[in-house]
């Protein structure tokens, strides 16, 4: 193997192994990512993402951006975030919008509670689009969703997908929120490649069982939009049996 072949192989390996928290993708996603790496200069590409505490700030996504050399890093993730909206979730940028909070400790503060109810994927995506439209960030070439572990109301993928009008989808379920966000990014940025990272395992067997149900629903939503799924649950190296 010559140096050029080693270089190409290493780039492929970086994409598959290091891209998206070092977790492996479905075969379809791996093939697509490998093909992209060989042809594309990442220094001319822009990376966007949304998620919860695992993604918020400069964590795995910043590592991906730095290693692969993306031009920009646009991250709207917030700790404690969910896919599902609340019945009183506000529209980002609306007249009465009070902001977003990743707080999780008990509180009676009504404004703080409203901010927490705004900490959902739909509002994050509205914020992301607004920041692109106002010139704060460029149009993304890659966008990764990585959330779901905090959702409790899963819903059914079939219910979320059967509604033809996007704004009529029930966004108070994880399934509905995921469909709205994925479809919105795809339609707003048609040249952007979208990926979804599944929730990872934890030290709780019951929580892991619930996550598997969520993953099945998210996978069905992604299949409907031809969005590759990154299997972080199976490949993250974390298992309940290893927790002490």
Where are these regions (language model features)?
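Conserved SGNH/GDSL esterase-like catalytic core that processes O-acyl groups on lipids
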Residues: 43-49, 54-168, 172
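Active-site segments of SGNH/GDSL-like serine hydrolases
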Residues: 146-153, 179-215
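Boundary at the C-terminal end of the N-terminal hydrophobic targeting segment
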Residues: 27-31
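Short, Lys/Arg-enriched N-terminal segments with co-localized hydrophobic residues
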Residues: 1-9
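Sec-dependent signal peptide recognition
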Residues: 11-16
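Catalytic His-Asp segment of secreted/periplasmic serine-dependent ester chemistry enzymes
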Residues: 199-244
């Amino acid at each position: 193997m010559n140096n050029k072949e080693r270089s190409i192989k290493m780039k492929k390996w970086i994409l598959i192994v290091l891209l998206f928290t070092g977790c492996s993708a479905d075969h379809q996603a791996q093939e697509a990512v490998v093909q992209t790496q060989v042809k594309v200069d990442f220094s001319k590409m822009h990376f966007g993402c949304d998620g919860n505490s695992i993604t918020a700030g400069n964590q795995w996504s910043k590592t991906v951006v730095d290693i692969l050399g993306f031009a920009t890093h646009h991250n709207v993730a917030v700790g404690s975030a969910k896919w599902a909206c609340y019945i009183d979730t506000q529209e980002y940028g609306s007249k009465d919008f009070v902001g977003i909070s990743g707080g999780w400790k008990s509180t009676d503060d009504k404004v703080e509670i409203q901010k927490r109810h705004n900490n959902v994927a739909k509002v994050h995506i509205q914020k992301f689009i607004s920041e692109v439209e106002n010139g704060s960030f460029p149009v993304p070439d890659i966008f990764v969703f990585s959330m779901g572990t905090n959702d409790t109301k899963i819903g059914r993928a079939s219910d979320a997908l059967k509604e033809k009008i996007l704004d009529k989808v029930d966004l108070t379920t994880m399934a509905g929120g995921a469909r709205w966000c994925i479809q919105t990014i795809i339609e707003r940025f048609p040249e952007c490649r979208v990926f979804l990272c599944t929730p990872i395992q934890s030290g709780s067997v019951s929580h892991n069982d619930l996550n598997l149900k969520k993953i099945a629903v998210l996978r069905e939503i992604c299949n409907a939009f031809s969005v590759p799924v990154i299997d972080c649950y199976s490949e993250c190296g974390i298992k309940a049996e290893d927790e002490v």
